[in-house]
Amino acid sequence: MDLRAKPASTCSNYTLLLPRLVLEVSKNDKICVACNSPDFVNSNGNLNVKDLEAHAKARLHSSHFAGFVLCPIVASEDKVSTFDMYYHVIQERTVLYRPQNTVLTEMCCIISALENCVVPSASLLIQYLDRANQLFNRHPSRDSLFLLGGVKTLISTLMHWHGFQHPDVSQLPRGLQSYELYKDLESFDAECKDLMLSMFCKSFKLGDWNEENEQLEAFTFNLFYSPTILTKHFKSKIIISSIKEACLLKDCVLSLI
């Protein structure tokens, strides 16, 4: 199958499936830390590919590296600050992914860096895109195709959110639509804005969550991220609970697709 011909996770110019909330996970005895990947931006605001590649290799070969925690979602399920899915669904989908090569590891790092990029620029986002395309062409596979679709969709979302213009945007799929709506609602008056947000950017499905699993009490778990428009979900205790459970109790998966 020619993976370059027709991405399995896209339809027309819209990505249907993508990985979200990607964090690096490290473990040492009963201590577990989930944190975002560094952005590897140099003093000139450009991506330092050499350091990014070195970081991915170091992570992959570290004895404390457990993998990446992430949640595969349908694009329409992302509601900016939550996911439109029931707790048992997000609990099942959230996985601890252990890439089997440096290409997949670096692509996960790129997604994590994009989600946590506090001050992006159009040129920086395109540099991430170029690097992700290079990585996919080096190692085309179902997983790298899935990750590349995520990179493209997040970059498209950030381009629109920050009002960036760039010629290469035409090759990107459409960004996450809930963020387009969320941005447009910023100009509405408060009463109308709250009503519209409640209708289109909120979910009431994550409401059947009970207390945490008692097995988790034996571990120390810390989660670190940068507050951006793409990481509002980390304020949800229910989403944090599913991430924590995946990091501490689930066996790692070696493939996503």
UniProtKB/Swiss-Prot annotation:
Keyword annotations of the record: Host cytoplasm, Host Golgi apparatus, Virion, Virion tegument
Main location: virion
Subcellular location: Virion; Virion tegument; Host cytoplasm; Host Golgi apparatus
Annotated signal sequence range: none
Keyword Protein transport belongs to the record: no
Gene Ontology CC terms, in alphabetical order: host cell Golgi apparatus; viral tegument
Superkingdom of origin organism: Viruses
Function: Plays a critical role in cytoplasmic virus egress. Participates in the final step of tegumentation and envelope acquisition within the host cytoplasm.
Family statement: Belongs to the herpesviridae cytoplasmic envelopment protein 1 family.
Protein's name in the database: Cytoplasmic envelopment protein 1
Species of the source: Alcelaphine herpesvirus 1 (strain C500)
